[in-house]
A protein has these predicted regions:
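Non-heme Fe(II)/2-oxoglutarate
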Residues: 1-93
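Short, glycine/small-residue-enriched coil/turn segments at secondary-structure junctions
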Residues: 91, 106, 119-122, 176
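Histidine-centered catalytic micro-motifs
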Residues: 110-118
Length: 197
């Protein structure tokens, strides 16, 4: 039984095999045509580069590619694990989307406090999924300031948490190493999606 909101921020150490993490990092580094400066959603629901808020390089994983399929498998493994902890989480009319891979460079990269759900295009986001693709010995934590919780980047670890306003978080600057992560979101289907099905 979940009694406190911080219990919905769940870590799964070593959930994803090292080989998969290495494969994702290799895909990111060799497919530079997909790399862009990290973007954020602004008040107009547009995605823009705002270096005061986020400094990272990220790639959106293309649909119908082997990497997309691998990310989908990782999302299912992650959510299945989450359902063992959060038994009442929804399982119907939900889907995974917005797969991305990013790097926060050593001593440079960060993402200021934010939430992952806003009015507009991200309103259907339910849970965030972060896969840590490498170890960062110093810095680079995902920090939930209002919950007094820091999550250390460790290769193969998955972090899941709700996207709503109760879960503001930020990415600390990695000190010892660059930080590679893959991210995705579990979304509710929109009314339009439900009407079409």
């Amino acid at each position: 039984v979940i009694e406190r909101i911080d219990e919905l921020v769940v870590e799964f150490p070593k959930l994803i095999p090292d080989e998969w993490c290495d494969l994702i990092v290799e895909w990111f580094n060799t497919n530079k045509e997909y790399q862009r400066p990290g973007r954020v959603v602004n008040n107009n629901d547009d995605k823009t580069v705002v270096e005061e808020v986020k400094v990272a390089t990220q790639s959106i994983v293309p649909f119908e590619t082997p990497m997309f399929d691998l990310m989908t498998e990782i999302c299912h493994m992650s959510y299945d694990s989450y359902l063992n902890v959060v038994e009442r989480a929804p399982i119907e009319d939900v889907y995974f989307r917005d797969y991305s891979v990013r790097v926060y460079e050593k001593n440079v990269g960060f993402f200021k406090p934010h939430v992952d759900q806003h009015a507009g295009g991200t309103v259907y986001r339910l849970f965030a999924i972060i896969l840590y693709l490498n170890d960062v010995n110093e810095g680079g934590e995902t920090e939930f300031g209002t919950l007094n919780k820091k999550v250390k980047p460790e290769k193969g670890k998955v972090l899941m948490f709700p996207c709503n306003f109760l879960y503001p978080h930020h990415a600390n600057v990695p000190i010892s190493d660059p930080k590679y992560i893959a991210t995705a979101f579990l979304n509710f289907k929109s009314i339009d999606d439900l009407q079409q099905s």
